[in-house]
């Protein structure tokens, strides 16, 4: 059964008024909220009632979702266009049951690789790993892009209060040299260890940054042997790693069944472990594993990722929602939106179904947002008074790591107030009467009132964590990962390929050749606009 069929459009005719729904049902919050571990999921401020939720759940039951969940966890090749399993969940699976992929028990492989990463982290932290000159390592520079950067960077920042190793961790991703130079300006070549995170060891941005970092190191040492003491790699291309000068003993595995945007649980998370210690890294994995079990074993009506996906898909199909705002009310989650943008938009930004047929319904949305309370002084105006339908996810942390309780209370009060304002708004009469009470005369009040009306009845979900710990962050990330998967199933698309990014890469290589040789075929085949842009650059 296709989720985005015409029947969903009739649900909109329920004409949900959130204020009325709360007034007439004192059990609404109890009915439309869930709890998992230390996370409370309140979806009571969404445009649903019992009938709508029942209809959405029935659609999920009639879909292939149950089978797809089993297939994913059992190692079926649900990434159909690349003929790959999707098993980032295996990286955090604490069970010992064999899991066979292409004739091999990957559980044993994962356990072995985790141990290798743990040993490296402990070796560097303890000082047993030394730089070429014999000095202890003080700085880690992770060179990667996309999933090899966004996930680890987000986690390292989010868990800053858990940093316990005295190692400073830096991230370099953009091909713009400024990204690399920001790191190189603050590190010492004699005490820096670089991580090259690239499955193919040929990603343009990562390779160029790595080559420049290598040159920077050798400018100091003037000895090729120094590379082995200052570089490790995470890649599946051993020949290229060896050619770079990295000891293969210090090359860590990337498997085809782990997509880049779901790779922070793998050796790609090495930079996380360098910051928070391997024990805390394991707690991050354990939190995600608890959600995997919840997702696999919980009926849909109480399954948080399923409810998240049903709501988002419902708004997309029925309200033509093209946008989703994500508002974490915690500065430590300042990179969380960037991370989820890739996870969500690269996964579900598709226009053909699994069979390769063009779909006639909307799939992925633009995910955007920023930390509170900053957003209140920037883009919240659009959320409250704009005429675009934008569902909102609020993320809040009940207790903080610091002792500034007045700050934390103000932060939470603002978060809850924003969700309440989106729900209730304020009518013309309310505004008009308030303006009269403030001292304006009737004419002045009438002139201003229309500009201060806030429609309200705008949907939001609030996710409240007891604390932001390695375990709870693992829970939060995994909830969104599985939400993305469920949406892909409901829309009948492949959430685990990303062919849309390939054309730009290919054209970029052609244009680079054209910029260096205007007699080349690549230059001759350019459009006039691109030729002019190249000419403008060359004339500067």
Swiss-Prot record:
Keywords: Cytoplasm, Gluconeogenesis, Glycolysis, Isomerase. Pfam families: PGI. It comes from the Bacteria. One of its GO terms (cellular component) is cytosol. Its EC number is 5.3.1.9. Catalyzes the reversible isomerization of glucose-6-phosphate to fructose-6-phosphate. This is Glucose-6-phosphate isomerase.
């Amino acid at each position: 059964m296709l989720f985005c069929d015409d029947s969903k459009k009739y649900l909109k005719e329920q004409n949900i008024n959130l204020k009325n729904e709360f007034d007439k049902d004192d059990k609404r919050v109890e009915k439309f909220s869930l709890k998992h571990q230390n996370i409370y999921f309140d979806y009571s401020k969404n445009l649903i009632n019992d009938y709508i939720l029942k209809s959405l759940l029935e659609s999920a039951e009639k879909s292939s979702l149950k089978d797809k969940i089993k297939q994913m966890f059992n190692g079926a090749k649900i990434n159909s266009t690349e003929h790959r399993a999707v098993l980032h969940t295996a990286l955090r699976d604490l069970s010992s049951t064999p899991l066979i992929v292409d004739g091999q028990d990957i559980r044993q492989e994962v356990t072995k690789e985790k141990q290798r990463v743990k040993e490296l982290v402990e070796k560097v932290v303890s000082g047993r790993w030394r730089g070429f000159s014999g000095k202890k390592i003080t700085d880690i520079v992770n060179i990667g892009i996309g999933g090899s950067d966004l996930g680890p960077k987000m986690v390292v920042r989010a868990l800053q209060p858990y940093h316990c190793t005295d190692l400073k961790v830096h991230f370099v991703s953009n091909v713009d040299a400024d990204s690399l130079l920001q790191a190189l300006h603050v590190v010492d070549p004699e005490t820096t260890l670089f991580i090259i995170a690239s499955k193919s060891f040929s990603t343009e941005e990562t390779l160029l940054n790595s080559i420049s970092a290598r040159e920077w190191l050798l400018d100091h040492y003037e000895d090729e042997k120094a590379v082995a003491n200052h570089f490790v790699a995470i890649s599946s291309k051993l020949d290229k790693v060896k050619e770079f000068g990295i000891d293969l003993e210090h090359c860590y595995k990337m498997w085809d069944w782990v997509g880049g945007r779901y790779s922070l649980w793998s050796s790609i998370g090495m930079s996380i472990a360098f910051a928070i210690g391997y024990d805390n890294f394991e707690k991050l994995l354990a939190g995600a594993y608890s959600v995997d079990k919840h997702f696999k074993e919980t009926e849909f009506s109480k399954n948080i990722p399923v409810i998240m996906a049903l709501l988002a898909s419902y708004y997309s199909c029925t309200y033509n929602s093209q946008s989703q705002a994500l508002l974490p009310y915690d500065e430590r989650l300042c990179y969380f939106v960037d991370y989820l943008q890739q996870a969500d938009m690269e996964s579900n930004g598709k226009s053909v179904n699994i069979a390769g047929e063009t779909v006639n319904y909307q799939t992925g949305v633009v995910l955007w947002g920023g930390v509170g309370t900053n957003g209140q002084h920037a883009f919240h105006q659009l959320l409250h008074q704009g005429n675009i339908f934008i569902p909102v996810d609020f993320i809040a942390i009940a207790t903080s790591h610091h002792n500034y309780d007045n700050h934390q209370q103000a932060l939470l009060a603002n978060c809850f107030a924003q969700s309440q304002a989106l729900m209730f708004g304020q009518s013309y009469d309310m505004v008009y009467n308030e303006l009269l009470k403030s001292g304006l005369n009737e004419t002045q009040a009438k002139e201003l009132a229309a500009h201060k009306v806030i429609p309200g009845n705008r949907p939001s979900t609030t996710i409240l964590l007891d604390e932001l710990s390695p375990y709870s962050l693992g829970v939060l990330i995994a909830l969104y990962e599985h939400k993305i998967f469920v949406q892909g199933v409901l829309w009948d698309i492949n959430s685990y390929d990303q062919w849309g990014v390939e054309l730009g890469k290919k054209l970029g290589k052609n244009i680079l050749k054209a910029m260096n040789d205007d007699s080349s075929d690549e230059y001759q085949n350019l459009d006039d606009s691109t030729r002019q842009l190249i000419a403008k650059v060359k004339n500067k």
